A protein has these predicted regions:
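Alpha-helical bundle regulatory/interaction domains
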Residues: 1-41, 87-232, 237-239, 243-249, ...
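Glycine- and acidic-residue-biased ligand/ion/polar-headgroup-sensing regions
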Residues: 52-54, 61-89
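Generic hydrophobic, amphipathic alpha-helix propensity
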Residues: 217-221, 268-273
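A short glycine-rich, His/Asp/Glu-containing loop-to-beta-strand
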Residues: 22-25, 41-63
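Alpha-helical DNA-recognition elements
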Residues: 258-259, 311-312, 323
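Short hydrophobic/aromatic patch on the recognition helix
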Residues: 252, 256, 304-305, 309
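Active/binding-pocket-proximal capping segment
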Residues: 242-254, 258-259, 269-275
Length: 326
């Protein structure tokens, strides 16, 4: 009788989240910031599995969120939407359900996800991908699979096969994670994922590039956002942004509407409210510090601030602070 091999190490994490920042922190070995953009209580879920050097995960978010960050060193990431209520924006490129996002750990990514965003993804060591795709050199691999964040398209059948392969592993109703204790199971699943991934990437092409005018509007939005977030101690106004970027109020509004389907006042207020929320969630806050934090982020009318905060997050600032202390 063949002797069973000893159990192989793996990790399995399944979580339900009630806060965008909590959700960002839940994904192992990623350094991320999430900002909630659409109003209402946040609900998210995450299934995160590590085995055979791979990270496979599925995450869902019910609210539109802005995401940015980096992942663990030396890996490529491929993400495939499962469901989404409208298109997303990945590093100035439109993301749909029929496309996939890709990037290397050397590069920071940015994603504006719509409401009802459900995505499966795999992070693969570069060496593993090299062995599977067998390019002649790293340069050839980078031509097939650029390091910079890209939206790619592939044959629908191949993309569906990879998506379904990942879903079959990440669905708690159909997969028992304890099976990963068997090295044979790990090897079989890893081989299936890498095989589908190599097929998809070999035939994938970059999605149609946005027009120069759209890229220009994305640049305006990014510059406006960066300026506002680096001047949190100042009550930045739309007029300030127009002066800084040397554009008209009408053009600034048009850029935000076209890229993010919102206006600059609403978007920048949402980012500031998220900044307040992150500070309120820090342990050690004392009663009365809510006013200080709100003023720090430029909110001077406290009743209006509390109303806007509750409209975005579904709870009052005092509730956030109280929950963080508990």
């Amino acid at each position: 009788m063949e002797q069973l091999q000893p159990p192989s190490p793996y990790t399995y994490n399944r979580r339900q989240t009630r806060d965008s920042e909590e959700h960002a922190e839940a994904l192992g070995e990623w350094d991320q910031v999430y900002d909630q953009l659409s109003p209402g209580a946040f609900e998210g879920s995450l299934v995160d599995i590590w085995f055979e050097g791979l990270q496979v995960f599925r995450e869902t978010t019910n609210r539109s969120v802005s995401q940015s960050g980096t992942t663990w060193n030396g890996c490529y990431v491929v993400g495939i939407p499962v469901n989404m209520k409208g298109p997303g924006l990945f590093s100035k490129q439109v993301l749909t359900r029929d496309s996939m996002l890709t990037f290397h750990s050397d590069q920071e990514f940015s994603l504006t996800a719509p409401e009802g965003f459900d995505v499966v993804a795999v992070a693969v060591p570069e060496k593993t991908l090299m062995e599977a795709m067998q390019p002649g050199s790293s340069e050839e691999l980078y031509q097939l699979f650029p390091k910079s964040p890209k939206v790619m398209v592939a044959a629908p059948g191949q993309l569906d096969e990879l998506r379904n392969c990942l879903l079959s592993i990440l669905d708690p109703a159909s997969f028992e994670p304890e099976l990963l204790a068997y090295p044979q199971v790990q090897k079989a699943i890893s081989s299936a994922i890498i095989g589908h991934l190599a097929e998809v990437l070999t035939s994938a092409t970059q999605a149609p590039l946005p027009t120069r005018s759209f890229k220009g509007r994305c640049h305006v939005v990014k510059e406006a956002t960066n300026y506002a977030l680096t001047h949190t101690t100042e009550p930045i106004t739309v007029a300030d942004l127009c002066e800084k970027l040397n554009i008209s109020r009408r053009m600034l509004n048009y850029c935000f509407q076209d890229v993010l389907s919102t206006n600059p006042v609403h978007y920048l207020r949402s980012l500031r409210l998220n900044g307040v929320r992150r500070e309120l969630r820090q342990p050690g806050n004392i009663p009365g510090s809510i006013r200080d934090i709100a003023c720090k982020w430029g909110f001077w009318h406290l009743p209006r601030f509390a109303s806007e905060y509750r409209a975005l997050f579904g709870e009052l600032p005092s509730e956030t602070a109280r929950n963080s202390r508990n």
